[in-house]
């Protein structure tokens, strides 16, 4: 294995940061050179992510391209990177949108362009680091680092209320971060590790969490991620951030940053706390449905085109959360697909709105009308992207929403009915907005002389439309790479599928996020052979386990990597506590309790801390 291959994730993570360092050494007046350097490093990063995507083996279980080296000894923090089907998608999305964001900002950013592109590339490093991290502390570090460049992108290059929007964005996110940090510290106290695979193993093998502790930890992580999504009722920061951010900031905020919330739910909440996830799932599904309907209704009455797109994100990401928490494999696949699809289509919508703002310096729908006459190419691109967001078949928005609605129906018909109503409402507010902007008579004389798309804008929009159509016509390459992730998460969520083996038992095969899978303890060989992830039942119909194809074994296990069922056997509560002395006082535990209490106090008052004179608009 070459050195480049062995450290490919490190290279793709820190290459944008290297570009930011190079820009820092360029003179402020060399604006053209700064833009080209930013584009070069973002394109190189994208090309490497494409290479990783095609080298990614969808038939292999577990993490790929792993990198691990010690960082701290006490506490044990490791520089641990790796990707699976879920994180590979999001790293590819980040690499895809960043160079397009650079191109979108090519002419619009003239004030302090050097600092702008430094922050943009630093933001890319933070986002990729979040998706590649497999150590809880490293994940938290990238999660926090990402806030700094986005704060400055909104606060310096935003619009009239940019400072208010930037502060609100940071306050909400920091409250969630405090909760998550408390949960991370508590998990370390229980498991003795920050390494995610080890934490998962130890939570399975030693039954370390009481039901009450699991509920509180789930809420700590879930609220942090729900704020980032944002899930109703934590959504109020998003419209302000979107409306005030520059176009590139809105593209990356909608396309990537919001996906950190849904990614965190899939990576941490569901695998780490399966019982609590099931317990809170009905409430979360209701909140997701409320977000779908509420976001659509509020978007319908928005006079500002950019704010309309912002509220559409609340509705679309409600679909993602619903798909994850109905616990159906097709719905979960649809949620992951919708994450990628939303990043492309909504990112394209923000690009289109930004291009229109550059021409008229207004986003009010009432200021337009009849633009299809003067901007025929622009209006054609806008129509295709709008139809993709609506969910028209053969475009990318249809696949994810269809899978989510189908899976929701199997869980509860009411979920599917409300989700389908959200699709109808999306068609209403998006097509109505398109009709008011592009059709009818030209009532404002300023609209008669607007220039149509130039070559740069046509290139950007053509790339987005090609991806939108490709994902809608042929989604299988994307769906195939997420199959093992969905199977492993579903296995982990089965309440009675947790393995509690005796420590003297031989090591057992791994499979994705779920390290141990239940087998038929009586040694029967089911016929016909079930597929990987399929339930295995006895003659009476009682579910006895799940089949998985294990392609990676634990060290020195000598296990045959053939399809097998892994036995389950209950163990006494507390087995494996020799990992850490439970009676020994842990100095980190009071800190965790303190952070939880502080965050609990901050959450309901975060909005009150913001400047009252700046408030306004529909919340």
PLM features per residue range, with description:
Residues 32-43, 164-174, 375-379, 456-461:
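Alpha-helical transmembrane segments and their helix-start/interface "positive-inside/aromatic belt" motifs
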Residues 11-28, 230:
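N-terminal signal-anchor/start-transfer transmembrane helix
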Residues 100-108, 125-137, 150-433:
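Hydrophobic transmembrane alpha-helices and their helix-loop junctions in integral membrane proteins
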Residues 574-576, 586-612:
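Arg/Gly-rich low-complexity intrinsically disordered repeat tracts
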Residues 1-8, 25-118, 193-203, 208, ...:
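Transmembrane helix-loop-helix hairpins at membrane boundaries of multipass inner-membrane proteins
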